[in-house]
Curated annotation (Swiss-Prot):
Listed cofactors: Mg(2+); Mn(2+)
GO MF annotation: an example: NAD binding
Keywords annotated in UniProt: Metal-binding, NAD, Oxidoreductase
Family membership noted in the UniProt record: Belongs to the malic enzymes family.
Name of this protein: NAD-dependent malic enzyme
Pfam families, A to Z: malic, Malic_M
Amino acid sequence: MNNDKRPLYIPYAGPALMATPLLNKGSAFSAEERSSFNLEGLLPETTETIQEQVERAYQQYKSFESDMDKHIYLRNIQDTNETLFYRLVQNHISEMMPIIYTPTVGAACENFSNIYRRGRGLFISYPNRDRIDDLLNNAANHNVKVIVVTDGERILGLGDQGIGGMGIPIGKLSLYTACGGISPAYTLPIVLDVGTNNPQRLADPMYMGWRHPRITGPDYDAFVEEFIQAVQRRWPDALIQFEDFAQKNAMPLLERYKDRICCFNDDIQGTAAVTVGSLLAACKAAGTQLSKQRITFLGAGSAGCGIAEAIIAQMVSEGISDEKARSQVYMVDRWGLLQEGMPNLLDFQQRLVQKHSNTKEWENEGNGFSLLDVMRNAKPTVLIGVSGAPGLFSQEVIEEMHKHCKRPIVFPLSNPTSRVEATPNDIIRWTNGEALVATGSPFDPVVHEGRTYPIAQCNNSYIFPGIGLGVLAVNAKRVTDEMLMESSRALATCSPLAINGRGALLPPLEEIHLVSKKIAFAVAKKAIEQGVALEITDEALNDAIDQAFWQPVYRRYKRTAF
C-alpha cells in the first residue's frame, strides 16, 4: 500500500529507478534519496512536494487545446510517474475522466499505432500462442490481481481496431485505480492479437499489430483457452475482466468461464449493473418500482440483452414472476421487435423474444414492429439505447413515449458521444423537462426554461472499480450474478435525486471513492454469504477494504542490495 508509512527498500538506483513508473518520484525525491540512489545531478536542485508537481502538470495539461493531445500528455505522465498521474487525475476526476476514458479513448484506439510512445501491458499475438507462459512472465508487474483483456474486435461503437483496442484495458485499469483504489502494481492490461478484419488497419503502414485476417472458430477458442490456462498457472487468484469482445464471442466466453475462474464481462455485466442501479434510483425518484415498468431496448446485442436479464432478475426479486417480467421487456434491433419464431436469433436473444399472444392486437405500419410501433402499442415507461446508432431516439419517438408517461426514463447509453441515440438537451426539450435522463458518455447540464438539469453519466466506472475492490478485499473466487445485483442496489442508495429529490441520478465523480467502497462492501459481503470468500466480520471487512485501498502518495525509499 502506498499509504503505508514504512519505507520501501529498493535494490536499484540512478536512471533505472527514474525509468520505473511505479517508483519514480521525479523532482520529489528527497535530498537523502538523491544521495542514496545516485540521483544527484540527474534532477533540478529544487525538491518539490507532490502537490507542487500536480500544479505544474495541470498547468501543462491546460496548455493543450485538443482532447487527444491532453490524452497523450496524461498517458505520458502515467508511463513516467504513476503516483503523480493518479494524484493529478484524482484531483481533477470530472475533468479528466472523459480524457483518459470515454469518449477520448475511442479516438486514441483508432490512432493507437500513430500515437504510440511506449509499450504498456502485454500484447499476446496468435503467432506466439505456444509461448504464452513466457510472455506472462515478461510482465512488468509480478503480483497481478486484476487483468483487463480485449481482442480489439468491438471497441466501443467503433468496431474492429485490432491492437488499437489496447487503449481500452489501459483506460479501464486506470479507473480501477483512480476510482476504486486498486494499486497500479496489481494491474495488467492485455490485448489478444488475433489479427484484424479492418481494411484500414491492414493497409496502414503504421499499424503495429499482426497483419492477418482475424482467427475465428475452434482456433480462436483454443487460443483463448490457452491464455486462460496460462493466467491460471501464473496468477491463479487474479480477477479477469473481459472487455470489448464482439457479440459472437462475448457471451459464449462469459458462459464458458464464469463458473471456472474469477471473471466478468464489463460490457455485459458491468453495463447491466450500473444501468439497473440507475434505474432503481430513477424509480425511487419517480415514486415507483422497477417491477412496475414497461421497458424498451433499442439494441439487442450482448450488452442490451445482458442489461435486460439483470433488470428481469431485479424485477423478480421485487415479487413478480419471471414470465411476467419478460412480458414487460421489449427488445428492438435493426429488424424490429424481437418476436418468437424470428430466424437467426442468438441463444441469449431467444430468451427475450415477445410472444405473439402479447402483440396480436398491436397495430403497425409494415412488417414487424418498429421502435415507433413499440412506443405506440407497448406504451413503455423506460427507453434504453445500446444500439451504437446515433439519432434513433427521434423527436417523434420521445414525444410518443411522453404522451402516456409523465416522467419517462430515457437512457441513451451508446458510446462514444458521436453514437448516442439522442442528446440530453433534445430529450429534456421534447418532454418539457419531465424526463429522467442518464447517458453513456459525459454531457454538460441542460438548461431548459430557466432550470438546470444535471445529466448523470451511466458509466461503468461507477460499478467495476467497486466490484474489483470488493473481490480483492476478500480474495473472492468468483463473481456471481448475486454479487453484481448487490452492486446495483448499493449504487442506487447513493443517488442524490433519489435521496434529496434534486440533482443527478448518480452521485458526482468527486464522491466516487465513497461509492466504490460502499459497492465493495456489498459485493464482498455477498461473496462471503455465497461461500466464494472466507467469512469475516463486517468490521474486519471494512478494515480489509480500507487496507486494500491504495492512495497516490510517495513513500520513503531506502536502498538495499540485490
